[in-house]
């Protein structure tokens, strides 16, 4: 993982997103529980688009910005929730006979082949910006429905609390700082990617959340689950707080 971080970091340096000094500082002071790219976004050192471009070069996969809320419901219905949540991927369009799946990290060829076999459809993978797939999975596929952040923002504009331009800035900031629970668990060092992928296959057949499934099966402790959930809550901005701050003439930074 350290080698992968260094490689991604070097790509970001080469692309001019950060300096060598900033990379060294990030590797030294990176917050526990965040991967290097995610930490750089969280710290305001790079944008989600700069990270997507670096990951695109690293994985040789096309990067693009998506609006998960604009995906047709018919397309969502054609892609099972079990696959979406397992592979952390969203169907965004079809290109001829191929289904295009957006993810925030590259989906490996073996997994792409497995999805293609299940759906009996050729698959193409593209990289979305950090947070875009996360908010899309929560909106379209999550069992647990909280306040819809986009609706909160639209309501604030309709009420005259925010201008459309302010809302766009807030949405960009909010989305780029959303983190998948599995990413935090991996970054905390509690579970490696290969083990997590195997466990996700088992979880497909249950109604439990990933955290609950891992605790029930003694993969992680309740304390570890709590630590990961608290970190996720701490690093993810609240939409209502962002709206209050901006409408009160505060600056999002």
What are these regions (language model features)?
Residues 1-253:
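Non-catalytic accessory regions
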């Amino acid at each position: 993982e350290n080698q992968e971080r260094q490689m991604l970091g070097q790509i970001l340096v080469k692309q001019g997103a950060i300096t060598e000094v900033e990379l060294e500082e990030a590797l030294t002071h990176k917050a526990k529980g965040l991967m290097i790219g995610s930490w750089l976004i969280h710290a305001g050192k790079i944008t989600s688009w700069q990270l997507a471009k670096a990951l695109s070069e690293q994985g040789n996969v096309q990067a693009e910005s998506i609006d998960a809320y604009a995906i047709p419901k018919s397309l969502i219905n054609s892609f099972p929730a079990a696959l979406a949540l397992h592979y952390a991927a969203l169907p965004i369009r079809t290109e001829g006979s191929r289904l295009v799946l957006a993810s925030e990290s590259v989906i490996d060829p073996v997994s792409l082949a497995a999805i293609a076999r299940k759906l009996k459809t050729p698959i193409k993978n593209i990289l979305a910006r950090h947070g875009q797939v996360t908010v899309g999975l929560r909106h379209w596929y999550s069992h647990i429905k909280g306040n819809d952040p986009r609706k909160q923002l639209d309501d604030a504009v309709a009420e005259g609390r925010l201008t459309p331009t302010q809302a766009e800035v807030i949405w960009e900031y909010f989305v780029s700082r959303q983190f998948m629970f599995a990413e935090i668990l991996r970054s905390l060092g509690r579970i490696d990617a290969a083990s997590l992928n195997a466990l996700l296959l088992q979880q497909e057949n249950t109604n439990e959340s990933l955290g609950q499934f891992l605790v029930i099966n003694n993969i992680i402790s309740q304390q570890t689950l709590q630590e990961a959930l608290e970190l996720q809550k701490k690093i993810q901005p609240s939409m209502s707080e962002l709206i209050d701050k901006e409408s009160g003439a505060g600056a999002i930074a």
